[in-house]
Amino acid sequence: MGDDLKKSGKTKFFGFSCHDGNVVELMNKAAKVGGIDAIMFRYNFRQYGDVQLNQAIDACKAAGIGLIAMKTQASVPDDLEKVVGFTSKNFTLGQAKLKSVWADERIDAAVSGMNNVQLVQENCSAAASPMQLSMNEFTQLNRLAALTASSHCKGCNHICESKINGKIRIGDAMRYLMY
């Protein structure tokens, strides 16, 4: 599809974003079909151990598809994050979350919501810093992921929606509230 649109002159680049539980399926299909220039998908410190996602990322990179990480903060309520007590001499928790995404060389760009000047400054500072995360900081992010997993939406709508007979599209409602 993407190749046809490019050949017809209707577009120079073709890509898509995906949120739901079919991210791996869509990425694998894009790698096989071709004609896709970029995919924006949920990627953050909570998903690093996901073997299927990592294989899909590898397939996309091998196919020359640019990968854009979104939902990089993988936030949960602040009080839960404070309980974990992330500590670093070099980075705030938000900066560490971004640095962890940027540490993956397969990721070409990252989207990070910034609703105030302080966040813009923090993100720019993290981007400009040549310092990498330490193993201790990665370990703290893994601990944060484990301890707050039950309070973070993983986008697996089929689980939540099946509990209410699928009559309410929970994932769509959550995205509506977010955006």
What residue spans do the PLM features occupy?
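Structured C-terminal cap/extension of enzyme domains
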Residues: Q55-Y179
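Glycine/proline-rich, positively charged
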Residues: M1-E81, S88-K89, A103
